[in-house]
Amino acid sequence: MIKYSQDIRVETVENSGNIEGRISKNIVLTPAEMLERASMFNIITLPSGSRIKEHPHIDDAEIYYILEGEAEVTDNGRTAIMRAGDVMFTGNGDCHSIANHSGKDVKFLACILH
């Protein structure tokens, strides 16, 4: 399967669930396109002042791969700064969050695996 950029759906989410502020999600692949082996494969843009609040992963795992910018993350209560090229894996039963306190957008790839 080849999917061209013009076929990638973009959604904006604001102050909903774990999201504080506004984020943009490029839904690169849908669960059906991944044969239901993953539930998310998105490029997320996190503007300055926005965050995805700490949340657990139960019966799944999530990967964040930073593409652009600088983000503050928590990994099971430990706070760290991540930059382009850095990756975080949150396994089953673990908690994480990501926030943008910089003056520039943060872009990252987010993938939830089953």
Label for each model-derived stretch:
Residues R51-K53, E72, M88, N92-S97:
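Histidine-centered metal-chelating micro-motifs
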Residues I43, I63, G77-I81:
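Short, surface-exposed secondary-structure edge patches
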Residues M1-A38, K53:
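A short, N-terminal "cap"/entry segment at the start of jelly-roll beta-barrel domains
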Residues S48, D59, R78, D94, ...:
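A generic "binding-loop/recognition-motif" signal
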Residues G77-N92:
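Short acidic-glycine-tyrosine-enriched beta hairpin
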Residues D59-A61, Y65-A71:
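Glycine- and acidic-residue-biased ligand/ion/polar-headgroup-sensing regions
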Residues N92-H114:
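Ligand-binding loop in jelly-roll beta-barrel domains
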